Amino acid sequence: MAVGVSPGELRELTDEELAERLRESKEELFNLRFQMATGQLNNNRRLRTVRQEIARIYTVLRERELGLATGPDGKES
């Protein structure tokens, strides 16, 4: 997964793609936290970037839910 995904890139994805991206990010965050607890994590910054990515995905989904933004095909999803 790319580091530092922009909100613009996320807005181009469909709801299904966002849900898949969210699942992958949550799984990665779980693994990073496990590595941190066992002392195997070298890059602590990655925890923050993954959490920010999850927040961005939730924000895009919420914008669509409230009708503040549309899906990538121009229709409301």
Curated annotation (Swiss-Prot):
HAMAP family: Ribosomal_uL29 (MF_00374). One of its GO terms (molecular function) is structural constituent of ribosome. GO terms for cellular component: cytosolic large ribosomal subunit. This is Large ribosomal subunit protein uL29. Gene3D superfamilies: 1.10.287.310. It comes from Mycobacterium tuberculosis (strain ATCC 25177 / H37Ra). GO terms for biological process: translation. The keyword Ribosomal protein applies. The gene is rpmC. Keywords: Ribonucleoprotein, Ribosomal protein.
